[in-house]
UniProtKB/Swiss-Prot annotation:
<feature type="modified residue" description="N-acetylmethionine">
    <location>
        <position position="1"/>
    </location>
</feature>
<feature type="compositionally biased region" description="Basic and acidic residues">
    <location>
        <begin position="22"/>
        <end position="40"/>
    </location>
</feature>
<dbReference type="GO" id="GO:0042803">
    <property type="term" value="F:protein homodimerization activity"/>
</dbReference>
<dbReference type="GO" id="GO:0015629">
    <property type="term" value="C:actin cytoskeleton"/>
</dbReference>
<keyword id="KW-0514">Muscle protein</keyword>
<dbReference type="GO" id="GO:0005884">
    <property type="term" value="C:actin filament"/>
</dbReference>
<feature type="compositionally biased region" description="Basic and acidic residues">
    <location>
        <begin position="51"/>
        <end position="66"/>
    </location>
</feature>
<keyword id="KW-0175">Coiled coil</keyword>
<dbReference type="Pfam" id="PF00261">
    <property type="entry name" value="Tropomyosin"/>
</dbReference>
<dbReference type="GO" id="GO:0051015">
    <property type="term" value="F:actin filament binding"/>
</dbReference>
<keyword id="KW-0963">Cytoplasm</keyword>
<comment type="function">
    <text>Binds to actin filaments in muscle and non-muscle cells. Plays a central role, in association with the troponin complex, in the calcium dependent regulation of vertebrate striated muscle contraction. Smooth muscle contraction is regulated by interaction with caldesmon. In non-muscle cells is implicated in stabilizing cytoskeleton actin filaments.</text>
</comment>
<comment type="similarity">
    <text>Belongs to the tropomyosin family.</text>
</comment>
<dbReference type="GO" id="GO:0042802">
    <property type="term" value="F:identical protein binding"/>
</dbReference>
<dbReference type="GO" id="GO:0006936">
    <property type="term" value="P:muscle contraction"/>
</dbReference>
<dbReference type="GO" id="GO:0046982">
    <property type="term" value="F:protein heterodimerization activity"/>
</dbReference>
<feature type="region of interest" description="Disordered">
    <location>
        <begin position="22"/>
        <end position="66"/>
    </location>
</feature>
Amino acid sequence: MEAIKKKMQMLKLDKENAIDRAEQAEADKKQAEDRCKQLEEEQQGLQKKLKGTEDEVEKYSESVKEAQEKLEQAEKKATDAEAEVASLNRRIQLVEEELDRAQERLATALQKLEEAEKAADESERGMKVIENRAMKDEEKMELQEMQLKEAKHIAEEADRKYEEVARKLVVLEGELERSEERAEVAESKCGDLEEELKIVTNNLKSLEAQADKYSTKEDKYEEEIKLLGEKLKEAETRAEFAERSVAKLEKTIDDLEDEVYAQKMKYKAISEELDNALNDITSL
């Protein structure tokens, strides 16, 4: 830009010099015309006064001829100076137009630079928001993973308790069968001895009480198994929900990664455009 201004100043100086030369040529032309007019008047006077003196007439004719040649040269110089002035005016106009275009390109580049800076700021803010969201999602995912581990642990514990209760029920059923067998043996001996019948009856009552006790325990175990089954079902439901949440979070993370990649590509394109604009400014 500074070089263009210096070039314009030099062109303006050349224009002023050309104008001065043109004015000087005009002055020479006028002087030559005046001299020519004066010589013509003198020639006419001499022709009237010295008609017989051909040498003098020829001398003055040569002077007139020289004056006319000088006049033609002055006219030619004036014409050349005017042409040079016109050429300089055209060059100045072209330089001014080039300067206007350069200023327009500079303004456009500055505007693009400002827009690129704004876009970069917006992209940076967007990336910070995305990073915060990703961080929150990671924390949420970690919490849900802990809940999933806890649910799996509860389910495993419920399975273990269920197996333990099932084993106890098998043992109780075996004891009940053995008690029933003993009761049958006692009943078979009932017809032989009344005394043994009483003993057997008492034993039977004791066995019945024990059977009732076992029945109460069995009901209790069944109720506990039912509760454990409900807890297991609830744990399985929580595990399924946690798995769905993890899948949803994985999809959200994938979407966020895609969005971050798109923002990076957009920022890269803006940077390239900004570099091109700066190169255009530098080339000016």
